[in-house]
């Protein structure tokens, strides 16, 4: 009996620990970039959907931006189309663009919306074409001082914040696929990390969170010690020193850009940890790395 009572008291203490964070975030908007292993592993996917739904029920307004690289790769492989990347960006010809749009908008987006709705949320799936949400233009990557044409790869020109605010501040959970639209109606494939940061900037989100397949930032990659909090200046220094590289660079640069444009806090989370979103937001210690100015 006493053992059972201790467990109940422990649960109550967890709720009490979360109370000040719930009060602080009530009515605020949190942008979550959902990607990595948490999109592939069914158990992790289920926990993420539970976290996002719970946020909405306690008065926080989550906006989800998702990737879909592995699924795009899978479809392209079946079509015998070889994927090419330049500085981590997918070279996107017309066929690849059609596949990316089909997978991101027609499959991945709708699966996430369905899962959130099954959890009791009211999710709405949209992409940058809807309501001119993401106005984009063609992106050229600079390689060795030369401009490289990546095809239908875009960069964000502007975000129609009104669309997202209207949904998020009501009872809905917007789920955004990173497809943008040009002035002439051309669709563009845009890096999902960049889209998440641009959305967070446009709506002045309270938090921007990137789910990744790493524990967090480290001064030494061989160390088990995670940096719990770090300044933007320190992050830039780590990039210069080669301690941050690859796919982590657009994430941390997105964090810094968002902070400079009014986002209060940014986070790099290990999406492989069950309920990582709740653990970061509603516990004293948190997990992962918080980046601040």
UniProtKB/Swiss-Prot annotation:
Chief localisation class: cytoplasm
Compartment(s) where it occurs, according to its Swiss-Prot or TrEMBL record: Cytoplasm
GO function term, MF aspect, one: acetylglutamate kinase activity
Entry binding sites for substrate: 68-69, 90, 189
GO annotation terms (biological process): arginine biosynthetic process via ornithine; L-arginine biosynthetic process
Superkingdom: Bacteria
Catalyzed reaction equations: N-acetyl-L-glutamate + ATP = N-acetyl-L-glutamyl 5-phosphate + ADP
UniProtKB keywords: Amino-acid biosynthesis, Arginine biosynthesis, ATP-binding, Cytoplasm, Kinase, Nucleotide-binding, Transferase
EC number from the UniProt entry: 2.7.2.8
Pathway membership, UniProt: Amino-acid biosynthesis; L-arginine biosynthesis; N(2)-acetyl-L-ornithine from L-glutamate: step 2/4
EC category name: transferase
GO cellular component terms, A-Z: cytoplasm
Positions bearing the site annotation: Transition state stabilizer: 33, 251
Annotated function: Catalyzes the ATP-dependent phosphorylation of N-acetyl-L-glutamate.
Membership in a protein family: Belongs to the acetylglutamate kinase family. ArgB subfamily.
Listed NCBIfam families: argB
PANTHER family: N-ACETYLGLUTAMATE SYNTHASE (PTHR23342), N-ACETYLGLUTAMATE SYNTHASE, MITOCHONDRIAL (PTHR23342:SF0)
Record protein name field: Acetylglutamate kinase
Organism: Caldicellulosiruptor saccharolyticus (strain ATCC 43494 / DSM 8903 / Tp8T 6331)
Classification lineage: Bacteria, Bacillati, Bacillota, Bacillota incertae sedis, Caldicellulosiruptorales
Chain's gene name: argB
């Amino acid at each position: 009996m006493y053992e059972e009572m201790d467990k109940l008291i422990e649960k109550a203490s967890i709720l009490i620990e979360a109370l000040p964070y719930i009060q602080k975030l009530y009515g605020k908007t949190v942008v979550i970039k959902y990607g990595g292993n948490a999109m592939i592993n069914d158990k992790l996917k289920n926990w993420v959907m539970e976290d996002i739904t719970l946020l909405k029920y306690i008065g926080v307004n989550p906006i989800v931006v998702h990737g879909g690289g592995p699924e795009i790769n899978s479809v392209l492989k079946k079509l015998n189309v070889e994927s090419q990347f330049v500085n981590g960006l997918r070279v996107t010809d017309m066929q690849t663009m059609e596949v990316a749009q089909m997978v991101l908008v027609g499959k991945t987006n709708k699966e996430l919306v369905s899962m959130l709705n099954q959890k009791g949320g009211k999710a709405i799936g949209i992409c940058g074409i809807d309501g001119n949400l993401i106005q984009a233009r063609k992106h050229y990557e600079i390689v060795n001082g030369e401009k490289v044409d990546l095809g239908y790869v875009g960069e964000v020109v502007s975000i129609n914040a009104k669309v997202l605010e209207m949904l998020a501040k009501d009872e809905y959970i917007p789920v955004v696929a990173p497809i943008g639209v040009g002035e002439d109606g051309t669709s563009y494939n845009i890096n999902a990390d960049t889209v998440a940061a641009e959305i967070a900037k446009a709506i002045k989100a309270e938090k921007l969170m990137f789910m990744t397949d790493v524990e967090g930032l480290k001064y030494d990659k061989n160390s088990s010690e995670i940096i719990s909090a770090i300044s933007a200046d320190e992050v830039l220094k780590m990039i210069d020193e080669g301690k941050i590289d690859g796919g982590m660079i657009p994430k941390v640069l997105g964090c810094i850009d968002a902070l400079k444009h009014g986002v209060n806090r940014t986070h790099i989370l290990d999406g492989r940890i069950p309920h990582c979103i709740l653990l970061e937001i509603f516990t004293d210690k948190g997990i992962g790395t918080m980046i601040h100015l």
